[in-house]
Design a protein with these regions (language model features):
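Short, polar/acidic, helix-capping and beta-turn segments at strand->helix junctions
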Residues: 1-151
Length: 151
């Protein structure tokens, strides 16, 4: 077992199978030394977490949803290479399903950000956006990631 997978095990995280896309795109794509991960949704035990921050979900539930999205991002990266090849989590972009009055999207994205820093340490620190939107099918969040890898 490699270093990052060992860390995931220590955290009690098992990477899920990457879902097949439902449209004309792929879960992750490598170009040069970058891997772009398509928006991942929060899935736990095969169940999609749904709801809107400020209506159906509280902040802690939304943070957990973005963490699940980040776990999905790592699973997508692993379809291309070992997670030990990651040299930097460059960027994360979070779409948080929330009411128009809610302003806690950045706080909700901390679930994803804190998770990747916990897994990767300093190389997990990244640039980030967090916006409130109406996510299709009332899914709680969607997180997109860019990672740099070594050969």
């Amino acid at each position: 077992m490699n270093k990052i997978e060992t860390r995931l095990t220590e955290l009690g995280i098992q990477l899920p199978e990457v879902s097949k896309p439902v449209a004309n795109y792929i879960p992750a794509k490598r170009t040069g030394n970058l891997i772009y991960v398509a928006g991942q949704i929060p899935v736990e035990n095969g169940i999609i977490k749904k709801g809107k921050l400020g209506e159906d979900l509280n902040l802690e539930e939304s943070k957990y949803a973005t963490k699940l999205c980040a776990i999905g991002c790592l699973a997508a990266i692993k379809t291309i290479c070992s997670l030990d090849k990651v040299t930097s989590i460059v960027a994360m972009h979070g779409l948080v399903n929330s009411t128009s009055e809610n302003t806690e999207q950045a706080d909700a994205m901390n679930g994803a950000s804190d998770f990747v820093v916990d897994v990767f340490g300093e190389i997990g620190k990244h640039t980030r956006t967090a916006v409130g939107v109406s996510v299709p099918h009332n899914i709680a969040a969607s997180v997109y990631m860019v990672a740099e890898i070594k050969e």
